[in-house]
Amino acid sequence: MKFEIFLVLALSLGQSAVYSIVSFLDKVTRAPLGEQTTSMNNPLSARPWFDLTYQLLDIAFALVPVALALYFMARSLGLGPRQVGFDLRRPGRDAAWGAGLFLAMGLGTLGLYAVGRALGLTTALSVANLEGYWWTVPVLLLSAARHAVLEEVLMLAFLFAHGRALKIAPWALLLGSALLRGSYHLYQGFGPFIGNAVMGAVFGWVYLRWGRVMPLVIAHFLLDAVGFVGFALIGPAIGIGG
């Protein structure tokens, strides 16, 4: 079971955390973080249709570890998507909880980003140019959905289920999941690391309390959708992008 955890994380968010830490060390030893910029959702090709193809392939293949995690949960623990709340049985309630969490975490995220920028501990974020192609916004929304499903299913449903089976204390699962979530955002600076670690702790507590991952997927999708699309529209006014 430990190997299953290692395999899933090594193919996905654990790998991202390692690269993020290395990227952070590269940046922090190069120049002050406040003077650097982190680009998000960059084009993958200068040729539009190949860029679209690469973007869609990237989204599709990034979800393979989710399928692997669901398979391991079913095979080793007898848990299907329904048992971890990854379903559409309660769309209204899940959407309401997701929207509430989005509002609470979104304000905190903006605040930590602003503080990090003011203290020079967070890089400037450069977001996608929405005027690029007609498919830019749909692909960004698909990317937001990809991140939401990948992170919440793996960080909560998969990791917590396997942790319980290994008799790991809930507080240790909560702390480990939160720190890992912060780690794969560390490439953006200290602010996003702290913000995402706090978000991981809050989401983890909500999942432990109610046992449904879908509201957290919805909240995460809304956060990323605003981050990818909304900030491209209002970003220059609040110091993001431009």
Where are these regions (language model features)?
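Residue-level signature of transmembrane alpha-helical entry/exit and packing/kink sites
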Residues: 1-8, 51-63, 93-98, 136-140, ...
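Interfacial segments of alpha-helical transmembrane regions
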Residues: 83-107
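Residue-level preference for alpha-helix termini and adjacent loops
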Residues: 80-85, 126-129
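N-terminal, membrane-interfacial amphipathic/helix-forming hydrophobic leader that caps
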Residues: 1-83, 228-242
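Juxtamembrane helix-boundary/capping and inter-helix hinge elements in multi-pass membrane proteins
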Residues: 79, 89-90, 165-169
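Generic hydrophobic, helix-prone segments enriched in Leu/Val/Ile
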Residues: 21, 25, 52-57, 91-95, ...
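Transmembrane helix-loop-helix hairpins at the membrane interface
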Residues: 13-17, 102, 106-110, 114-242
